[in-house]
C-alpha cells in the first residue's frame, strides 16, 4: 500500500509540476509530499471556483437556458478531458488552464445576465477547441 501511495504521489507531483512553477506558490516547500499537497490544493480550488461560477450562472437563468448551459457544460467537460489527456493520464497543468479559461467565460456570462443583458447565443456557444 505504501508503494501505491508513493507511486501516486510521485505521479501527481510530476503531472502538476508545471502548475506549481506557473503559480510559484508551491516553490517554498522542500519535500515532494508538501509540494504535491500544495499543488493539489491549487488545482482543487480552481475546480471549486469553476463549479461555483457555473452554479451561480445556472441560478440566474430561465429553465430553457439552464438546459442549454447544462448541455454545453457537459460537452465542454468532454473537450477538457480529451484535450488534456496525455498517454492515458491527465495533464493537470492543461486541466488547470482550461478550467480557468472556462471559469472566466462563465463569469463574463454571469455578469451579463445579472446586468440584464444575458445573451442566449453565448450561453449555448461552444467557444473552445
Where are these regions (language model features)?
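Bacterial N-terminal signal peptides that target proteins for export
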Residues: 1-8, 12
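N-terminal signal peptide c-region/cleavage motif recognized by signal peptidases
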Residues: 15-19
Amino acid at each position: 500500500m505504501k508503494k501505491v501511495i508513493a507511486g501516486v504521489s510521485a505521479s501527481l507531483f510530476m503531472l502538476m509540476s508545471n502548475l506549481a512553477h506557473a503559480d510559484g506558490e508551491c516553490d517554498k516547500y522542500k519535500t515532494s509530499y508538501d509540494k504535491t499537497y500544495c499543488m493539489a490544493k491549487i488545482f482543487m480550488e480552481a475546480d471549486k471556483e469553476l463549479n461555483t461560477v457555473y452554479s451561480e450562472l445556472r441560478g440566474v437563468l430561465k429553465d430553457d437556458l439552464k438546459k442549454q448551459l447544462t448541455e454545453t457544460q457537459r460537452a465542454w467537460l468532454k473537450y477538457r478531458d480529451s484535450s488534456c489527456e496525455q498517454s492515458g493520464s491527465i495533464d493537470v497543468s492543461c486541466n488547470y488552464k482550461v478550467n480557468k479559461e472556462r471559469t472566466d467565460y462563465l463569469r463574463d456570462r454571469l455578469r451579463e445576465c445579472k446586468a440584464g443583458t444575458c445573451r442566449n447565443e453565448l450561453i449555448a456557444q461552444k467557444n473552445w477547441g
